[in-house]
Curated annotation (Swiss-Prot):
PROSITE patterns noted in UniProt: SIS
Protein name (Swiss-Prot/TrEMBL): Phosphoheptose isomerase
Cofactor(s) this protein cannot do without: Zn(2+)
Designated gene of the protein: gmhA
Coiled coil: none
SUPFAM superfamilies according to UniProt: SIS domain
Chief location: cytoplasm
Tagged with keyword Metal-binding: yes
Amino acid sequence: MKNFIEAQIKSSIEAKEKILKDGQYIEQIQSIVEIVIQAYKLGKKVLLCGNGGSAADSQHIAAEFVSKFRLDRKALPAIALTVNTSVLTSIGNDYSYKNIFERQVEAFGKEGDVLIGISTSGNSENITLAFKKAKEIGITTIGFLGKDGGENKNYCDFPLIVPSEDTPRVQEAHIMIGHIVCDIVEKELFGEKVDE
């Protein structure tokens, strides 16, 4: 058991080291931070969606924006489209599960907002449809994806694809990236500038 535990920890570290060592990922994260900062400066909001563990990540990241990450500061508008069971089940029943995020993007999204769709496989149909609807409205779309980015990468403005085939490692990297984004956005907007 000890060897298995150590192997899992090493695997997690290796996935993150791939991101750290490839300057492309650092630049992509920086671009995402800048997009979110610009949206907030313009009085816009961030919408987030995902399935399963990615739904939990959506809620986690939204909570960091609305409550706080490190600093006591003004709340930032962020909505996880995964939390209203009445809306989710109504859309799933009356339309289809594939439409659960698309309909909410149509209802809550405004031009200039940001949508972060999270999918470890990159092949979540409901994320693809949410991205398509967001583009119709004029919402900037960001994908936190895994594996090869799947179909989702073709429908978002900024796909960030974690370089791993292992779902748990992708999920761990997604929440790490979410934390980095929240941390820098908060610092930049509320007086603690981050060094280049």
